[in-house]
Regions:
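Cofactor-binding active-site loop characterized by glycine-rich and histidine/acidic residues
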Residues: 361
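N-terminal alpha/beta PP-like core and its mobile active-site loop of ThDP/TPP-dependent enzymes
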Residues: 1-358
């Protein structure tokens, strides 16, 4: 897209708008006034801009952004005041990392330009004490991507890249810090690709051979079970899982880290608790912590399949859960593929009715 922007801050807002951000959850700071001005100017000129939602603390701001992203599937954005606002995000930063949701977290940063040298340069004493060696380091290990906007950057491109990364599966938070003199730098005409023009990567399709193997194991299992946690992030997965469970007479249980409604809790095949040690086939679908290690964990002899957009859980340093196969796939796509395959196999186990009756007690 090509825009006329008085300063880099206007380009930041324009790129958010072009990237599908409709709400900016905002906690104010002296270096963040460019957001308010750019949004007000866009509205006055009849152009689209994110709606600025004012909050008085960063934890509810980021949690609100996560809730919006979870309920709509769209990216949300936040803005916080320099390093202290970034630290105020607190535990919500952890929630964002584990959420699988696209959120662009922004924060102002103090100017470092000497007084009088440029627009937005230091003009008050607090700017010296806000200056850190690495503000982004506060949240780096929790982010999919982070960047500090610099004078040589194309501000619209930086925002589009942030949204591209946040919205690419597995979705997650990204962080962009915006020094005041950079946000207020005169710009004029600016051209940049939108996040969609950069290209949001489509969810991975499951490996056909792996799906065939898992489907056969489930079809011919004596006691199959499926563990869920995050698959309900996409509501379309719920009826697919119900159909698969009913076709197989398969027990479904929430993992110890349940985060979404994945399966109807009043369905006869839903289990509040289950002893996985007696199951011969166990599938963990989008579940970070599928079960607690111990006597009720799957037997070493059981066939265990893990299906996830990040099946190896690369963000968790120590991860001891074993698996016979790990399949990289979006939960909804995997359920579609499994349903097709179990129907192709065509066999319904004679024990299916008995299993249904047993797990429904």
């Amino acid at each position: 897209v090509e825009i006329e922007a008085s300063d880099a801050g206007e380009a930041v807002v324009a790129a958010m708008t072009a990237g599908g951000v409709e709400l900016l959850f905002f906690t104010s700071g002296s270096e963040l006034a460019f957001y308010q001005e750019a949004i007000a100017k866009a509205r006055a000129q009849g152009r689209k801009a994110p709606r600025l939602v004012l909050l008085t603390h960063e934890v509810p701001a980021l949690n609100a952004a996560l809730g919006y992203a979870a309920s709509t599937g769209k990216p949300a954005a936040t803005a916080a005041h320099v390093d202290v606002g970034t630290q105020h995000y607190g535990s919500a930063i952890h929630s964002a990392m584990r959420s699988g949701l696209p959120v662009l977290i922004t924060a102002g940063a103090p100017p470092v330009g000497m007084p009088g040298t440029r627009r937005g340069a230091r003009d008050a004493g607090h700017f010296w004490v806000q200056d850190l060696y690495d503000q982004n380091g506060i949240v780096r290990q929790y982010m999919k991507w982070e960047h500090r906007l610099e004078m040589q950057d194309n501000p619209g491109l930086a925002v589009s890249r942030a949204l591209q990364v946040a919205c690419t599966a597995p979705c997650g938070p990204v962080y962009l810090s915006l020094p005041r003199e950079v946000a207020l730098a005169p710009l004029g005409r600016s051209e940049f690709p939108t996040a969609q023009e950069l290209g949001i990567a489509r969810p991975a399709a499951p490996d056909p051979d792996a799906i065939e193997e898992v489907a056969k194991r489930l079809t011919f299992a004596s006691n199959p079970a499926l563990v869920v946690s995050g698959s309900g992030r996409d509501p379309a997965s719920v009826p697919l899982l119900v159909e698969l469970a009913e076709h197989l007479g398969m027990a479904v249980v929430d993992s110890s880290s349940r985060s979404y409604h994945c399966f109807p809790m009043d369905h006869p095949l839903y289990q509040a608790t289950i002893d996985l040690s007696v199951m011969d086939v166990v599938v963990a679908l989008d579940a970070e912590v599928p079960w607690m290690p111990g006597p009720k964990a799957p037997s070493p002899k059981a066939y265990v399949a893990v299906i996830d957009e990040d099946p190896a859980k690369l963000k968790i340093p120590t991860y001891e859960f074993r698996a016979s196969v790990r399949v990289t796939a979006n939960a909804t796509a995997a359920l579609h593929a499994l349903l097709r395959e179990v129907k192709r196999i065509g066999k319904k186990s004679p024990e299916r009715g008995e299993r249904w009756a047993a797990v429904s007690k």
